């Protein structure tokens, strides 16, 4: 009996340590980004840094305005959600509630494969197929644009949205659906008036995971967006927060390098804000 209690305490201790390691990693990343990012913001000025429209670190009078990057990231993420969320949501409803087991297995494997494709492959296919297609379709000088980034990101967030939404929908108690059907509701009415509302917290989590994937993506976006520090327009080349960091960190020094850490800090705060908003929403729904 004592040996079992000792084993149980040991396991609990190991789990506690692992949990503390996870928390410590988050705290260390936060502290490192704050320490590395604040000096540049202090030197440049918070207003000029966040709302400046010109990014030209190589000029004789360097300018470090990241408003084009912020807006490009927001517009690109929002556009990918507009495209990807409806597709992912309705696909999840179909696979969870309507598809035969064989179709569900086949499409589930395809979704898993889509999730495992490296970002650089998405970017390469987008650069070779999507970018020329946009250039020809809209008669543009260059198809590398915000629109191309939106489409690529929409495809990349589909696996997260579909898989998490399916899990949430599958977890809905069958008794709820049976009761709805017994009252005369059609299967479609039951899905969208009973199953989906019951699973809304899981579906919201799926969307937030998609947002995190979209706003944090760098390689694929850099390959299809043109990576130019312009104010965002749908058919023009743009640069996201992530691509600004990844494209400049290899050779940046001095204030330029510090400014890139500041951009990483802004990106980190964006993710924290999104997660906090989700938690607030879910707590409000539970009340």
Residue spans for each PLM region:
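Generic hydrophobic transmembrane alpha-helix motif, especially the helices
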Residues: 112-157
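Transmembrane alpha-helix signature in integral membrane proteins
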Residues: 66-94
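Transmembrane alpha-helices
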Residues: 164-165, 187-222
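Transmembrane alpha-helical segments of polytopic membrane transport and secretion proteins
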Residues: 1-19, 278-287
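Cytoplasmic-entry segments and transmembrane alpha-helices of multi-pass inner-membrane transporters
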Residues: 12, 87-126
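Interhelical loop and adjacent transmembrane-helix boundary motif
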Residues: 221-268
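Glycine/proline-centered hinge or cleavage motifs at structural transition points of membrane proteins
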Residues: 118, 183-184, 197
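C-terminal transmembrane helix and the adjacent membrane-cytosol boundary/short C-terminal tail
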Residues: 166-170, 174, 181, 250-287
């Amino acid at each position: 009996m004592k040996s079992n209690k000792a084993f149980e305490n040991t396991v609990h201790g190991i789990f506690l340590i692992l949990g503390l390691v996870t928390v410590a990693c988050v705290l260390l990343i936060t502290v490192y980004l704050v320490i590395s990012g604040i000096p540049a913001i202090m030197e440049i000025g918070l207003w000029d840094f966040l709302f400046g429209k010109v990014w030209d670190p190589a000029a004789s009078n360097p300018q470090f305005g990241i408003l084009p990057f912020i807006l490009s990231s927001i517009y690109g993420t929002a556009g990918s959600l507009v495209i990807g969320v409806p597709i992912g949501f309705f696909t999840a409803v179909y696979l969870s509630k309507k598809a035969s087991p064989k179709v569900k297995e086949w499409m589930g494997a395809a979704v898993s494969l889509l999730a495992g494709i490296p970002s650089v492959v998405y970017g390469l296919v987008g650069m070779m197929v999507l970018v020329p297609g946009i250039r020809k379709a809209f008669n543009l000088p260059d198809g590398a644009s915000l629109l191309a980034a939106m489409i690529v990101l929409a495809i990349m967030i589909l696996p997260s949205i579909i898989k998490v939404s399916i899990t949430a929908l599958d977890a809905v108690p069958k008794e709820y659906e049976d009761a709805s059907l017994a009252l005369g509701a059609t299967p479609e009415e039951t899905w969208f008036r009973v199953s989906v509302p019951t699973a809304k917290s899981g579906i919201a989590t799926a969307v937030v995971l998609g947002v995190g994937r979209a706003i944090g993506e760098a390689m694929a976006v850099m390959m299809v967006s043109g990576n130019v520090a312009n104010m965002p327009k749908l058919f023009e080349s743009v640069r996201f927060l992530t691509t600004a960091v990844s494209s400049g960190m290899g050779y940046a020094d001095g204030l330029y390098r510090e400014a890139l850490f500041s951009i990483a800090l802004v990106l980190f705060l964006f993710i924290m804000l999104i997660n906090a908003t989700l938690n607030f929403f879910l707590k409000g729904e539970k009340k």
